[in-house]
Amino acid sequence: MPELFAYTDGACSGNPGPGGWGALLIARDGDTVVKERALKGGEAETTNNRMELLAAIHALEALERPARLTVVTDSAYVKGGVTGWIHGWKRNGWKTSTKKPVKNEDLWRRLDAAQARHEVQWEWVKGHAGHPENERADALAREGMAPFKPGKSKAGR
């Protein structure tokens, strides 16, 4: 049975500013890539953390059936949030340990729902360190951001 991986990344030009997200879904049988799907998108005004979250969300939501997969991210924010902090946030009514509202609550809720139907293992990799699939996810995120960068006409979107 093929192993499924989702490599995700977000990018932002300014923080906040125009941003993009990218996700690369790969099914592997050993070292052989059986199937691959690239996803990308962007927004005119966003933050890097929102784009990182959306990359993971879109990767999980793109899967038509429940699956066992590894999501690989270079975002300590996403990995730390989804594997640890989120449990406390939910217990505390979406408040942090200091009783402040959780930033990006809308996306954390969506990510929580998206991962609930799958068996997900989360893995962190160092960004911009030559990891081929992470570099490809980064390129997709930058492509997703491109139509929203200053100087691009709205007709080109």
Curated annotation (Swiss-Prot):
Recorded hits in InterPro entries, A to Z, give: RNase_H, RNaseH-like_sf, RNaseH_domain, RNaseH_sf, RNaseHI
Keywords from the UniProt entry: Cytoplasm, Endonuclease, Hydrolase, Magnesium, Metal-binding, Nuclease
Its function? Endonuclease that specifically degrades the RNA of RNA-DNA hybrids.
EC annotation from Swiss-Prot or TrEMBL: 3.1.26.4
Task: Note the PANTHER family from the entry.
Answer: RIBONUCLEASE H1 (PTHR10642:SF26)
> Sorted alphabetically, which CDD domains does this protein's record hold?
RNase_HI_prokaryote_like
> What is the required cofactor set for this protein?
Mg(2+)
Task: Please tell me where Mg(2+) 1 binds in this chain.
Answer: D9, E52, D74
Xref: NCBIfam families: PRK00203.1
* Cofactor mode of binding and number, as noted: Binds 1 Mg(2+) ion per subunit. May bind a second metal ion at a regulatory site, or after substrate binding.
- Source organism per entry reads Dinoroseobacter shibae (strain DSM 16493 / NCIMB 14021 / DFL 12)
What family name appears in the similarity comment? Belongs to the RNase H family.
- Report which gene this protein is encoded by: rnhA
Q: What protein name does the entry list?
A: Ribonuclease H
